């Protein structure tokens, strides 16, 4: 069986899934699998388990009368895709479908992806990542709230120069984790697979941050939390915004570094 490899702090609760229609927003009870016990309680950015909130409905006046959209479908018309909550196969399926649909409409117009996620299943996140790299559209990523674990990888995977964060967001990177059960041979097979995924994730972060593999390995050895400014210096994002462009302005207002604020110290390479 293919092992479900998660990044720590991944599947901690049922979250709000981006929906193409109101019927797609459903409550998924937590499954009693070993993965649900992997999320450490010390994770400050874990999403509390709760019932899904109601999805707002937007009513528009058209020449043929009123037309109602759920809020995510209305945002999709503006080429906005939301990645909210833990990333699993169902969230990945919805996000991939939206990306492919927007490319079919136009492969030149940018797509805006808003991320507020504690992370999740590695293979689900990589499915979204591969689709982002596959389509021809420029993808503008935005971190609102948090982009932890696989969420930070999707944030970094945006088009260079178009990766953004709001000023009070948090970004976190770390190595993958997983649970293995069964016979010793089965555990060894799954351990080998997670080590391969670890190297694969390191190379992806190195590609998009322009950091060396040695720096990436040292930074991701344990949970590494960053402010947006620190993530910008590390190479995960490009701009920290206060608000979008106003009328008559060409550029949005950027967060400027405070005088005397210490720079992010790069982790020293681990010595043998």
UniProtKB/Swiss-Prot annotation:
PROSITE patterns in the cross-refs: CLP_PROTEASE_HIS, CLP_PROTEASE_SER
Is the keyword Metal-binding assigned to this protein?
no
Catalytic activity field: Hydrolysis of proteins to small peptides in the presence of ATP and magnesium. alpha-casein is the usual test substrate. In the absence of ATP, only oligopeptides shorter than five residues are hydrolyzed (such as succinyl-Leu-Tyr-|-NHMec, and Leu-Tyr-Leu-|-Tyr-Trp, in which cleavage of the -Tyr-|-Leu- and -Tyr-|-Trp bonds also occurs)
Keywords (alphabetical) are: Acetylation, Hydrolase, Mitochondrion, Protease, Serine protease, Transit peptide
Name a GO CC annotation attached to this entry. Answer: mitochondrial matrix
List of catalytic residues: 149 (nucleophile), 174
As stated in the Swiss-Prot or TrEMBL entry, residues carrying the post-translational modification N6-acetyllysine are 207
Q: Which top EC class is named for this enzyme in its record?
A: hydrolase
Targeting presequence: 1-52
Q: Where in the cell is it found?
A: Mitochondrion matrix
Q: Give the molecular function GO annotations.
A: ATP-dependent peptidase activity; ATPase binding; serine-type endopeptidase activity
What's the stated role of this polypeptide?
Protease component of the ClpXP complex that cleaves peptides and various proteins in an ATP-dependent process. Has low peptidase activity in the absence of CLPX. The ClpXP complex can degrade CSN1S1, CSN2 and CSN3, as well as synthetic peptides (in vitro) and may be responsible for a fairly general and central housekeeping function rather than for the degradation of specific substrates. Cleaves PINK1 in the mitochondrion.
Per the similarity annotation, which family is this? Belongs to the peptidase S14 family.
Task: Outline the subunit composition.
Answer: Fourteen CLPP subunits assemble into 2 heptameric rings which stack back to back to give a disk-like structure with a central cavity. Component of the ClpXP complex formed by the assembly of two CLPP heptameric rings with two CLPX hexameric rings, giving rise to a symmetrical structure with two central CLPP rings flanked by a CLPX ring at either end of the complex.
Question: HAMAP family in the record, alphabetically?
Answer: ClpP
Spell out the protein name for this chain: ATP-dependent Clp protease proteolytic subunit, mitochondrial
Species the sequence originates in:
Bos taurus
This protein's encoding gene: CLPP
């Amino acid at each position: 069986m293919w092992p479900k490899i998660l990044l720590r702090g991944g599947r901690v609760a049922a979250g709000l899934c981006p929906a193409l229609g109101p019927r797609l927003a459903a409550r998924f009870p937590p499954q009693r699998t070993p993965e649900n016990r992997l999320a450490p309680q010390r994770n400050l950015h874990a999403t509390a388990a709760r019932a899904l909130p109601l999805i707002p409905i937007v009513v528009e006046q058209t020449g043929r009368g009123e037309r109602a959209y759920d809020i995510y479908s209305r945002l999709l018309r503006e080429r906005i895709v939301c990645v909210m909550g833990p990333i699993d196969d169902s969230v990945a399926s919805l996000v991939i479908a939206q990306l492919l649909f927007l490319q079919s409409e136009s492969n030149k117009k940018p797509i805006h992806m808003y991320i507020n996620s504690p992370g999740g299943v590695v293979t689900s996140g990589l499915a979204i990542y591969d689709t982002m790299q596959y389509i021809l559209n420029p993808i503008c990523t935005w971190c609102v709230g948090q982009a932890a674990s696989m969420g930070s990888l999707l944030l970094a995977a945006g088009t260079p120069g178009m990766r953004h964060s709001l000023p009070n967001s948090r970004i976190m990177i770390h190595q993958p984790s997983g649970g293995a059960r069964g016979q010793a041979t089965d555990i060894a097979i799954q351990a080998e697979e997670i080590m391969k995924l670890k190297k694969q994730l390191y190379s992806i972060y190195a590609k998009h941050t322009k950091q060396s593999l040695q720096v990436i390995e040292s930074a991701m050895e344990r949970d590494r939390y960053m402010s947006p400014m620190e993530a910008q210096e590390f190479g995960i994002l490009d701009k920290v915004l206060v608000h979008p462009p106003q009328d008559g302005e060409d550029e949005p207002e950027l967060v400027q570094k405070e005088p005397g604020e210490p720079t992010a110290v790069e982790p020293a390479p681990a010595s043998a």
